[in-house]
């Protein structure tokens, strides 16, 4: 729905360096900035958004704190409004290699071609899992960009960076990426 959202503010701080976001999403509209999953408020924010500024209809993972600290935007364009997309963002800022600090999977495949690729510094503390920082699905507090579409099987994992195979698998007959409705994961504190 175009103007509904869920929000939760953690009462205790979890692991701000290592976490996983997994979500199945289906768009109703294309072409405008839409916030899918966020942490923070407008101006000090992070999360997943459909972005028109970095490549029309690109699903970007970002964090902005005065300037862009994280900006991972694949070249792949997501404009099919009849299709369910599965996105997994695995964050581990403790990694020595910058490109291992944020891994981006779309429909089971790790993305390797990016319009922008700004990785966080080593051991960076993100806005996610921070006590007192709002985590929101479908909106960003203080902003007007609601997500317009449907979402399913949203998982937020605190303390572990899982790859896409924890949340889905390829159908042996059709070759299509399919949902794992009961992922075997450890959710952590938040």
Show where each model-derived region lies:
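Short surface loop/edge beta-strand patches of beta-sandwich-type extracellular domains
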Residues: 1-18, 70-79, 141-143, 180-185
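Extended recognition patches within non-cytosolic domains
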Residues: 1-5, 96-98, 103, 112-119, ...
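Beta-strand-rich, repetitive solenoid scaffolds
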Residues: 7-9, 38-40, 47-53, 60-64, ...
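Short hydrophobic/aromatic patches on beta-strands that form ligand-binding or substrate-lining surfaces
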Residues: 21-28, 87-89, 137, 151-155
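Short tryptophan-centered beta-strand motifs in secreted/extracellular beta-sheet-rich domains
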Residues: 23, 82-93, 104
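Extracellular glycan-interaction patches encoded by glycine-rich segments
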Residues: 125-151
């Amino acid at each position: 729905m175009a103007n509904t959202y869920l929000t939760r503010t953690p009462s205790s701080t979890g692991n701000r360096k290592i976490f996983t976001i997994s979500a199945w999403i289906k768009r109703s509209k294309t072409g405008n900035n839409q916030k899918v999953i966020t942490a923070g408020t407008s101006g000090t924010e992070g999360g997943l958004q459909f972005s028109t500024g970095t490549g029309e209809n690109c699903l970007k993972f970002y964090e902005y704190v005065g300037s862009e600290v994280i900006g991972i935007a694949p070249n792949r364009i997501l404009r099919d409004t009849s299709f369910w997309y599965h996105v997994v963002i695995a964050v581990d800022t403790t990694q020595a290699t910058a490109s291992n600090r944020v891994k981006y999977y779309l429909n089971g495949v790790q993305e390797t071609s990016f319009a922008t690729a700004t990785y966080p510094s080593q051991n960076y503390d993100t806005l996610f899992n921070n006590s007192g920082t709002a985590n929101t699905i479908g909106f960003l507090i203080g902003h007007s960009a609601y997500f317009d579409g449907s979402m399913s099987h949203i998982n937020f994992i605190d303390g572990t960076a899982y790859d896409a195979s924890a949340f889905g698998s390829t159908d042996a007959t059709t070759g299509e990426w399919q949902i794992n409705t009961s992922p075997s994961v450890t959710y952590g504190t938040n």
